[in-house]
UniProtKB/Swiss-Prot annotation:
Top-level division of the source organism's lineage: Eukaryota
Pfam families hit by this protein: B3
Single GO cellular component term: nucleus
Gene that this sequence comes from: REM10
Chief location of this protein within or outside the cell: nucleus
Name of protein: B3 domain-containing protein REM10
Stored InterPro entries: B3_DNA-bd, DNA-bd_pseudobarrel_sf, REM_fam
Portion annotated as DNA-binding: 11-103, 150-247, 276-372, 460-554
SUPFAM superfamilies membership: DNA-binding pseudobarrel domain (SSF101936)
Organism: Arabidopsis thaliana (Mouse-ear cress)
Length: 555
């Protein structure tokens, strides 16, 4: 059931994702501060409350920043990087705080935690603060005997060959190994090996040891199939984990022990997942080699000043693409790389793709995830762009305004060829023709003055032409082919890709009469899977007096 506290129509609220270093302070969003707090918080203290405890935390406000006392609140609520905190104002400087996990599910706290808070409340706020800080230091310097301080490892042929061992993410996080770069492995006799510790920038940030795992196994006679456990015995600048033997009975006991978790993240979702979005592949965004990103996704994840992103498929392969923010429209889009990603992964117009932000550092990583029925229900039918056609697009979700598809994309619709030649020459790239616009809005037949209607009914063998993509990306059309099909003048021509999406481009002619396809032909080849120096076959098809070059196959 959704938490009604997150949907209060009366009390103003704001949310903030927790980034590295969040325990030192938290900044209040500018818009919220200017509207509700400016002028009322100078040198004052805010009161924070939550459903997890009956306590009230007093936190100093320095300008827009929550400072002294904030760390105590984060420790008491076991807040971590990636969590989201929602503040609801209940008084001038009184806030109710709800903590959400990375999946935007409300964090649930165990009963023992609440009882401890009740006891600590009787001791006074200052004692609680010092007690929690001392407990934190003890946990870092002397690991306890709980299951969180150990893990089971299996030697395999693969991890020996790769000299890499993946360690449980829960073990690494619960013991504060996120910022550690080396770890010491110690055997039962006390001999030690220093090994590198790393965290992947993808695959949900898995932790692994490398450059030394193989040496450790060989020195201790460990072979594929052996199972043993490591226990964290020292957690300082360089953590130390010690090997201890595992019998079948020990393994069964270890696996059957219930894990004591302070918090649960499997509660029913109480807020939309701000770390993911669903995109639609269209003929338009393929030809333009760009994808517009939801503004809510960009803003909520702090990506406003990012200039590159990494798109990763389900197999872990990645593509780096550029990101651009249009200051005059407020739109966010990817440029140079979107088409390459789609082609490499066999994505075609009409496909729906779900991306999730799995790594948010210098270069954010968006991973492709499988769609489920819940994701499909989130799509607004009026924004459906499947089958390569933009049925209706608004930028209301980005800018709070309505616009037609072409206004949103900054395009103009021409219903005939009466526009000026200078305007035609400025078209930046080949662009798929929206079938609805061509049939429903453009009632007049496009006139092709360069076509000889007497000669357009050529024989079937004259309809096919083979071209080769070269480094110059210039696709010249053979003179005999053009002559036999009655195309004698430069102008506009339409290309049809393997997905039946139509691309409008220019038909150019040089001084000696050689005709070639204009800008956009390289993108057309990329969508059709044609690589450099590969040849492919096009078929000439006529629609009334309009010639179309349809992609047939690669040679």
């Amino acid at each position: 059931m959704a938490n009604p506290l997150l949907y209060s129509p009366i009390n103003p609220q704001f949310f903030q994702p927790l980034l590295p270093g969040f325990t030192n302070h938290l900044d209040i969003p500018v818009a919220f501060f200017l509207k509700y707090l400016v002028g009322t918080n100078v040198g004052k203290t805010a009161e924070l409350r939550s459903d997890a405890s009956e306590m009230t935390w007093k936190v100093k406000i320095d300008g827009r920043r929550l400072s002294n006392g904030w760390e105590d609140f984060t420790i008491a609520h076991d807040l971590r990087v990636g969590d989201i905190v929602v503040f609801r104002q209940e008084g001038e400087l009184v806030f109710h705080v709800t903590a959400l996990g990375p999946s935007c599910c409300e964090i649930q706290y165990g009963e023992d935690t609440l009882e401890e808070d009740k006891i600590e409340k009787l001791c006074g706020t200052e004692n609680v603060s010092s007690k929690k800080k001392s407990l934190k230091r003890e946990a870092e310097s002397a690991p306890d005997n709980s299951l969180d301080s150990c893990f089971v490892a299996t030697v395999t042929g693969s991890n020996l060959k790769r000299d890499t061992l993946y360690i449980p993410k829960e073990f690494a996080l619960s013991n504060g190994l996120m910022n550690k770069y080396q770890i010491v492995l110690m055997n039962e006799e006390g001999e030690s090996w220093k090994i590198d510790l790393r965290r992947e920038a993808y695959n949900y940030g898995r932790f692994y040891m490398r450059r030394g795992w193989r040496s450790f196994c060989i020195a201790n006679g460990k072979k594929p199939g052996d199972v043993f456990a490591f226990k964290l015995v020292k957690n300082e600048e360089t953590p130390m984990i010690q090997l201890f033997p595992m019998t079948i009975e020990d393994l069964d006991k270890l696996q059957s022990l219930p894990r004591h978790k302070i918090r649960k993240t499997e509660a029913a979702p109480s807020s939309p997942d701000l770390s993911s979005f669903v995109a639609t592949v269209t003929a338009s965004n393929l030809s333009r080699d760009r994808l517009y990103l939801p503004k809510t996704f960009i803003m909520s994840n702090g990506l406003l000043k990012k200039f590159q992103m990494c798109l990763m498929n389900e197999e872990g392969e990645s593509w780096t693409i550029d990101v651009k923010h249009e200051a005059h429209t407020g739109r966010f889009l990817t440029i140079r790389g979107w088409r390459r990603f789609c082609v490499a992964n066999g994505k075609k117009p009409g496909d729906l793709l779900k991306f999730k932000l799995v790594h948010n550092e210098e270069t954010p990583v968006l991973q492709l995830l499988p769609l489920n029925s819940e994701d499909l229900h989130k799509l607004n039918p009026s924004n459906d762009t499947r089958h390569g056609q933009s049925l209706k697009v608004t930028k209301k979700e980005f800018l709070g305004m309505e616009a037609t598809e072409n206004e949103f994309l900054g395009e103009e619709v021409y219903c005939n060829d009466s526009f000026k030649a200078s305007e035609k020459d400025t078209l930046p790239f080949a662009e798929p023709i929206n079938e609805d616009i061509r049939q429903g809005q453009c009632s007049q037949t496009i006139k092709q003055e360069y076509v000889s209607t007497e000669e357009k009914n050529s024989t079937s063998q004259n309809r096919f032409v083979t071209l080769t993509l070269t480094h110059s990306s210039k696709l010249n059309l053979p003179f005999e082919f053009m002559k036999r099909n009655g195309i004698k003048k430069a102008g506009k021509i339409t290309m049809v890709d393997r997905y039946d999406a139509k691309w409008r481009t220019s038909l150019l002619m040089d001084k000696i009469g050689t005709m070639s396809l204009g800008r956009g032909s390289k993108g057309f080849c990329e969508v059709n899977g044609v690589e450099m120096n590969e040849s492919f076959i096009l078929e000439l098809i006529w629609e009334d007096t309009v010639p179309l070059l349809k992609f047939c196959s690669k040679v």
